[in-house]
């Protein structure tokens, strides 16, 4: 169905996220990883083995495609945190895993964990989304929900890691347009342990949703009221309790409002 939107993208990034695709490994985090070099792969695998029990690893199956080129090495790992490492960290399991993913993506040159949730996975590449689906042989996966996207980058480069969906743990984001609030959003979110390294504004939106939802416990409705805050004129027309709630969200999280075309 994404083929009907071919002209909405320009071939500089396409991808899919499928939920429910790994029922046999539903209790394990599925790391999908791009590697630019063998050295990066070996170093990243050493880091994974130091912090996680790897129950299965393999190349992600792909087929040769004339319009998908310059592919990195693409591997998949089903993992669970090592009990000793998790206990020593004094972190909740999801926080332990998200910090590991962010650290690898920030510090390990040539390795990028682009999917890290449970019973779900992201498949993306530098190409049109319908070609990406063929490249990853997505007809072999069954999911209860899919998201997909085709990029038309203007201010940011087209590359494998910059394609959508963007993901952290189970959250995936697709986004159209450029956001003028990127730098304000980035400066705020990086105060809480996130690091924006992947050359596109959608990355910061993913981290905002993770921060507000997973860390602060907001509902998706509340998150929407932060990142797409109502106009003040709209807030003023609400009943007193709702007006107070929306005013608090807009004032307390002003730096997380996402604005732009």
Question: How would you describe each model-predicted region?
Answer:
Residues 1-261:
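Conserved short alpha-helical segments that host acidic/polar catalytic motifs at enzyme active sites
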């Amino acid at each position: 169905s994404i083929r009907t939107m071919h002209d909405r993208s320009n071939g500089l990034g396409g991808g899919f996220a499928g939920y429910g695709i790994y029922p046999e490994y539903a209790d394990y985090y599925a790391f999908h990883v791009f590697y630019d070099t063998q050295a990066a792969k070996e170093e990243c695998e050493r880091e994974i083995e130091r912090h996680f029990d790897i129950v299965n690893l393999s190349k992600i199956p792909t087929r040769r495609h004339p319009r998908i080129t310059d592919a990195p090495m693409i591997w998949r790992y089903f993992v669970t945190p090592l009990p000793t490492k998790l206990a020593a960290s004094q972190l909740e399991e999801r926080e332990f895993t998200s910090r590991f993913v962010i650290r690898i993506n920030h510090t390990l040159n040539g390795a990028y964990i682009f999917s890290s949730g449970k019973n779900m996975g992201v498949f993306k590449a530098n190409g049109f989304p319908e070609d990406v689906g063929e490249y990853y042989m997505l007809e072999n996966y069954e999911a209860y929900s899919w998201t997909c996207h085709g990029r038309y980058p203007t201010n940011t480069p087209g590359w494998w890691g910059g394609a959508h969906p963007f993901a952290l743990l189970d959250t995936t984001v697709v986004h159209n347009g450029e956001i003028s609030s990127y730098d304000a959003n980035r400066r705020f979110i990086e105060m809480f342990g996130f690091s924006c390294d992947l050359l596109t504004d959608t990355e910061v939106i993913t981290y905002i949703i993770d921060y507000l939802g997973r860390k602060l416990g907001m509902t998706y409705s509340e998150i929407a009221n932060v990142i797409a805050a109502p106009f003040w004129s709209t807030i003023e027309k609400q009943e007193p309790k709702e007006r107070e709630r929306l005013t608090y969200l807009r004032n307390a999280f002003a730096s997380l409002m996402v604005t732009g075309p």
